[in-house]
A protein has these predicted regions:
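Conserved RecA-like ASCE ATPase "motif II neighborhood" in helicase/translocase motors
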Residues: 378-421, 630-631, 635, 649-651
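Post-DEXD/H (motif II) to motif III coupling segment of the RecA-like Helicase ATP-binding lobe
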Residues: 415-475
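Inter-Walker segment of RecA-like/P-loop motor cores
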Residues: 351-391
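Long, hydrophobic alpha-helical segments
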Residues: 687-739
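Conserved C-terminal RecA-like helicase domain
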Residues: 505-646
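ATP-dependent helicase/translocase motor core
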Residues: 2-332, 341, 345-356, 384, ...
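Conserved interdomain linker/interface between the two RecA-like ATPase lobes of SF2 helicase motors
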Residues: 455-541
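A short beta-strand element within the Helicase C-terminal
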Residues: 649, 653-678, 694-698
Length: 739
């Protein structure tokens, strides 16, 4: 009989491409279904999906007895009473365990070497992560004392892992959230409580259902971090019946708990969002199906993920890379960033997700050593180092191996050359791109687009999705012609005209620099919400067009606040930007990490600015390459911690830098497309209730450029979703400019 090998395994995704909603015919109107009836219906739906209902396990002793039975069945053993007592005391229900230690047992330490009474040692598993279907899923309800009686608990192998709090239809879902918040303070975390094993909370009022991680760092504001489940096209699944049929499908729930979650180095449990899971699943499916069809080393064997800036691409790419390293036919996984500063940031993030899962390299030689190591660690590197390695080494063992490349926002000048070398050197590779702003024919400068390099789009989650889901904020853009005599230049779009010497001179005219600097100082505290005396408010960034502009603004701003009793702490950073061709319209010029290539006047000014910084923060940085890198890192940390009030930049920090407490971007620079979206997105991270949008204050007329960019990276209706109305539009009676 002929043997056929499968070309591509079934997609078996947990984030579904299509889902038919439950019939709503039998659903009673809001107000008619009691909370108890909603709970009963929910449990019946779970039973019909294969959950075992255990009606009488509502006391701690009954819960422990059930856990014993389930763990014995999972491990094919029988504990004597004394062995079970020791197992509880030493490991399962250790009195000194915190919530974090219990979570660590589920994620990392789920196998325990137990010494039985007869002296033999055996591995006892809490969960089976290899064969996920072996884990027993049960449901109990109304556990606990009268005061804190929990609605519905999902047990996995006898351990409470998901807690569901229900409110009847029509009641605000926040009430369920507040109840969980109260329980976790009062009783979930009491000594010797198996409820410390809880990983996920689900809250529902029947019509809106959300999930979120159980983490020590939760407060009442973290309602903002609750999530709806969704289909792969990002359509939300909110109704409890639909949520139950999808999220609570047994395999889906177990995958969310054990595969699509990360317990990071700071003891925070991160449960992935549906779009992050969807992207990861589709990358893994593509690797497997391309391997089986032998479609490696071409765009057909890969694809790209379009996830908007601020939607958590780093976690998604990490999980995709981590799961790819676990595929038995994959030898190496590379995560490639396009700038040295992102190399460092990604290493820090990846190490936070899993300290031992990554190899970084300071040099091309270090990268070469990492390719030779026989382990399954993810190699994080820059495109420059990878390109140098391919140019200098014509024959390396890794070139013949099965390799996955995941590129983050790589569409710089070096990208074209690196792609040619990749095709030449690596014989069996699969490559995937992550981008918040793809290159389409409309914003491409050459022939290459994101799709022509990486293959088709595998998943998208665009800015309108993120704003709807309240994962990022809208932008409020104000254009200010502070000095009317310069207005013509500020509205000029032609780069050639703008770069003409006389126009450059006018844009840097002392009157213009002074006028803009005064405007910034006068409006800074209002824009950054620092008008209340004790309010820490936010901080800001100022994007300027050149090193010369940075110098003039830095001097003028400091000069103007000499007499101030509360001067702003101002810092600046820039470096040499080689004169390279852009690969997409609106790319922000890439600055390298070597200030030594700058002219002497720029270097002198940078040394002076770093000197001021050293005095301000009692540090000791300089302009040589290594010290400059350390300055960059220290500055990044202080901007995130709001120790720096205003950071003046030319290109650095405008892409890939996350500082949720930054809410304002001042702009004296012509931004377009990719560069505009990247720069604006520094301001729109969710932070707290005071931060309602990202403030963009421009001293060039970027209105049309803004509309062009958000239309390209969203859709024709995007403008009304992405932009808050400007002051001018409110004055004109809420008129919307047609997109």
């Amino acid at each position: 009989m002929t043997q056929y090998s499968t070309i591509a395994e079934l997609q078996n995704f947990i984030v579904l491409d299509s889902y038919t909603r439950s019939s709503m015919v039998s659903e009673p109107p809001a107000g008619y279904q009691t909370e108890a009836a909603l709970e009963r219906e929910f449990i019946e739906d779970l039973i019909s999906q294969g959950y075992e209902y255990v009606p009488s396990h509502v006391t701690p002793d009954a819960l422990l007895c059930n856990a014993r039975n389930q763990l014995q069945a999972l491990n094919n053993i029988v504990f004597t009473d004394s062995e079970w007592g020791r197992f509880l005391e030493e490991y399962l229900d250790k009195k000194s365990d915190s919530l974090a230690e219990k979570t660590k047992k589920i994620h990392d330490n789920y196998i325990y070497d137990f010494v039985f009474d007869d002296g033999h040692i055996q591995n006892i598993y809490l969960v089976d992560k290899t064969n996920i279907a072996r884990n027993k899923v049960q449901v109990i309800n109304q556990f606990g004392a009268q005061k804190n009686r929990y609605d519905v608990t999902i047990l996995v192998n006898g351990l409470p892992m998901v807690q569901v709090e229900l409110k009847k239809r029509g009641v605000a879902i926040r009430e369920a959230f507040n109840q969980v918040h109260r329980y976790s303070k009062e009783s979930f975390n009491s000594e010797s409580s198996l409820y410390k094993y809880l990983q996920v909370f689900v809250i529902s009022n029947g019509t809106d259902t959300r999930y979120f991680a159980n983490t020590v760092k939760r407060d009442k504001n973290s309602f903002d971090f609750t999530m709806n489940w969704a289909k792969s096209d990002n359509t939300l699944i909110k109704d409890l019946k639909d949520f139950t049929a999808t999220f609570f499908q047994k395999n889906t729930l177990l995958q969310v708990l054990f595969t699509y979650s990360v317990f990071d180095a700071s003891n925070t449990l991160l449960i992935m969002r549906p779009y992050q899971i969807a992207a990861t699943e589709r990358i893994l499916w593509k690797i497997k199906s391309s391997y089986q069809a032998k479609k490696w080393s071409n765009p057909e064997g890969g694809g790209y993920i379009w996830h908007t800036t601020g939607s958590g691409k780093t976690l998604t790419s990490f999980k995709a890379a981590q799961l790819a390293t676990q595929l038995d036919f994959i030898d190496k996984v590379f995560f490639v960033v396009d700038r040295k500063d992102l190399d460092y940031q990604t290493m820090k993030e990846y190490q936070r997700f899993s300290p031992d899962s990554v190899n970084g390299s300071e040099s091309t030689a270090g990268l070469k050593r990492n390719t030779e190591k026989n382990n399954d660690k993810i190699i994080v590197t820059t495109i420059q180092k990878l390109n140098n390695l391919m140019k200098s080494e014509s024959d390396l063992p890794v070139y013949q191996k099965q390799v996955v490349f995941i590129f983050d926002e790589c569409h710089r000048s070096q990208f074209g050359e690196a792609q040619k070398n990749l095709k030449k050197r690596f014989k069996r590779y699969y490559q995937f791109g992550f981008t918040g702003t793809p290159i389409f024919p409309e914003n491409a400068l050459g022939a290459e687009t994101t799709a022509s390099v990486f293959g088709r789009e595998l998943h998208s989650y665009v800015i309108t999705d993120a704003i709807r889901d309240e994962k990022v904020l809208k932008f409020k853009v104000d254009y200010n012609d502070v000095r009317p005599r310069f207005k013509n230049l500020e509205t000029e779009k032609d780069e050639i005209k703008l770069n003409a010497a006389e126009n450059q001179k006018l844009l840097l005219h002392p009157d213009r620099i002074k006028g803009i600097s005064q405007y910034i100082l006068q409006n800074f505290r209002i824009k950054t919400h620092r008008t209340q005396g004790n309010n820490k408010g936010f901080n800001a960034m100022f994007a300027v067009n050149s090193v010369e502009a940075a110098k003039l603004y830095y001097q003028e701003l400091n000069n103007l606040q000499k007499e101030s009793d509360r001067p702003l702490k101002i810092a600046t950073i820039f470096s040499f930007a080689p004169n390279e061709e852009q690969s997409a319209k609106g790319d922000i010029k890439d600055e390298n990490f070597d200030p030594s290539a700058m002219d002497s006047s720029a270097k002198e000014f940078l040394a002076k600015a770093i000197g001021d910084y050293n005095v301000m923060f009692k540090t000791n940085f300089g302009v040589d390459s290594k010290e400059f890198q350390n300055y960059y890192r220290d500055l990044a940390k202080r901007v995130k911690n709001q120790e720096v009030d205003l950071l003046i930049v030319v290109g650095m920090f405008l892409t890939g830098f996350d500082a949720p407490a930054l809410n304002t971007l001042f702009v004296d620079k012509n931004l377009r497309y990719h560069g505009l979206m990247q720069a604006f997105s520094r301001t729109n991270r969710i932070y707290d209730a005071t931060k309602t949008f990202g403030n963009i204050v421009t001293f060039r007329d970027l209105e049309q450029s803004t509309i062009d960019a958000i239309t390209l990276f969203g859709d024709k209706n995007t403008r009304n979703v992405v932009l808050e109305k400007s002051y001018k539009e409110y004055l004109e009676g809420f008129k919307d400019i047609a997109t």
